[in-house]
Amino acid sequence: MAEVHIIGQILKAVDFAEPHLYCKWSLQSGNAWRLVQGEVQGQSHVASHRLQSSSDFAQPLDIHLSTASVQGWPRLLVEVYAVNVLQQSWPVGYGFVHVPSTPGTHRLEIGTWKVAPNGLWQSLRERFGGGGAALSKTDLLYSGVERYKLQTLSSGKVIVELNLIFRKFDEYGVEFK
């Protein structure tokens, strides 16, 4: 079977209004893909920024996958959460990116969005640290079928650095250029 090694890190979150952030991530792929080694989901520590508009995570990724088909190519999903002084957390950004289909080093910027408040009370609650609306199903992140019904706001960006190693794809007639 062909193999993909994903080695890298979720570097940081930039341009978020909230000062204390952490990131949940997961790697989604099709049915033909199997995890050989590593973790396909995780969570970073809480990172704070005072003067910059950047929260550094340096969350390592080390995932080894095998596949019999290129269908269902992996995608990296990120959810950024804010934390207040009462240790309450709420989502401030959702986003995803497909893992590049070329080997080598890649620096990716994942644009994120959040669910827009749908009233005055929810706007006030979000502004003064009570939290915003959350998605009940994360498949709405990458499925456009139901996502178009949501009212959303642009959020910050998550910077990811990936080193990709591909093995045995040439044996299956797949060439990467």
From Swiss-Prot:
**Where in this chain does the record put each C2 B9-type domain?**
2-118
Entry annotated with the keyword Cytoplasm: yes
Question: Does the entry annotate any disulfide bonds, and if so which pairs?
Answer: none
What does the UniProt entry say about where the protein is found?
Cytoplasm, Cytoskeleton, Cilium basal body
Indicate the secretion signal residues. none
Q: What did gene disruption experiments reveal?
A: Simultaneous knockout of B9d2 and tctn is viable and does not show sensory behavioral defects. Males produce motile sperm and show only slightly reduced fertility. Sperm flagella show weakly ultrastructural defects including broken and disorganised structure. Length of the transition zone is decreased and recruitment of the tectonic-like complex compromised.
What Pfam families does its record include?
A: B9-C2
State whether keyword Nucleotidyltransferase applies: no
Q: Which GO annotations describe the biological process of this protein? A: ciliary transition zone assembly; cilium assembly; sperm axoneme assembly
Q: How does it assemble?
A: Probable component of the tectonic-like complex (also named MKS complex), composed of B9d1, B9d2, Cc2d2a, Mks1 and tctn.
Instruction: State the family it belongs to.
Output: Belongs to the B9D family.
User: Any idea what this protein is called?
Assistant: B9 domain-containing protein 2
What organism does the UniProt record list as the source? Drosophila melanogaster
